[in-house]
């Protein structure tokens, strides 16, 4: 049995490029969502994500099967950058915010250029990662609610604006310490972040909501008590019903045309 070293090398380069880009998405995803273990690099995570994305892009260009194949990327990237600059102006942010927006826009350029089929694969990876993490954290959160002592450390973020008891698999905001059943926020700094991101991930998983990781995401969304998450979920459900209704209408119309032919 002969092994084609050239083909194997080209295949490896494509795989490495894909792994680098998945890593860049991981950094950008968890960094932008303010998870507690990304707090030490919160100020410069866009640079790390951009460097990983750049390495992936350059390596992909040397492969005979590149992973950055989409041609429609310039307009959405410019729109994203302009929106970011506008938000910075409205909030009167400093130069660091504008630099961060530039790196985020460059990262979005890579995302818009990335192969759409592979992009669905990445969304599934993120859904499985977060869904798996939530499944592990649910029993510990239940133990906390019933009063079982769990190891934790104090955590302060953003000059004291956020103050938590960090149980590693989930956070409890200090303002919620005496609440009978606090809002579940997992590893995120606010329950709203958990509600929003689980809803958006569920949107990418339309048609696969019965999978274990999507059920886990749905539970996390529900117990986050996030109004934003509930609004997103409602919009997604109505969108799904509209699409399914459209499919049924097209199928019925096709049958009518076939029978009348």
Which residues make up each language-model segment?
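Alpha-helical transmembrane segments of multi-pass inner-membrane proteins
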Residues: 124-148, 172-225, 231-242
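Juxtamembrane non-transmembrane "cap" segments at the membrane-aqueous interface
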Residues: 147-168
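Membrane-interfacial loop-to-transmembrane alpha-helix junctions, especially the N-terminal start
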Residues: 11-22, 62-77, 122-126, 212-213
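Transmembrane alpha-helical segments and their membrane-water interfaces
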Residues: 54-59, 88-142
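Structural signal for the C-terminal ends of transmembrane alpha-helices
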Residues: 53-65, 110-119, 204-209, 238-246
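N-terminal signal-anchor transmembrane segment
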Residues: 1-63, 81-87
């Amino acid at each position: 049995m002969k092994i084609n070293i050239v083909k194997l090398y080209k295949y490896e380069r494509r795989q490495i490029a894909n792994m680098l880009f998945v890593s860049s998405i991981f950094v950008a995803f968890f960094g932008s969502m303010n998870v507690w273990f990304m707090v030490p690099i919160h100020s410069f995570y866009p640079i790390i994500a951009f460097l990983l994305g750049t390495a992936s892009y350059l390596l992909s260009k040397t492969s005979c099967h590149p992973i950055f194949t989409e041609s429609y990327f310039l307009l959405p990237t410019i729109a994203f950058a302009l929106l970011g600059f506008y938000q910075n102006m409205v909030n009167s942010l400093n130069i660091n915010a504008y630099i961060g927006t530039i790196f985020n826009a460059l990262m979005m350029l890579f995302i818009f250029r990335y192969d759409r089929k592979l992009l669905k694969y990445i969304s599934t990876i993120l859904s499985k990662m977060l869904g798996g993490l939530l499944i592990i954290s649910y029993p510990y959160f239940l133990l906390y609610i019933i009063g079982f002592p769990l190891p934790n450390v104090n955590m302060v973020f953003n000059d004291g604006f956020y103050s938590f008891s960090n149980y590693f698999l989930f956070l409890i905001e200090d303002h919620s310490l005496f609440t009978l059943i606090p809002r579940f926020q997992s590893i995120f700094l606010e329950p709203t972040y958990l509600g929003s991101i689980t809803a958006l991930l569920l949107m990418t998983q339309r048609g696969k909501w019965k999978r274990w990781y999507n059920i886990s995401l749905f539970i996390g969304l529900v117990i986050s008590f996030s109004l934003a998450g509930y609004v997103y979920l409602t919009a997604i459900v109505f969108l799904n019903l509209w699409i399914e209704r459209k499919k049924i209408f097209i199928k019925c119309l096709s049958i009518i045309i076939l029978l009348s032919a």
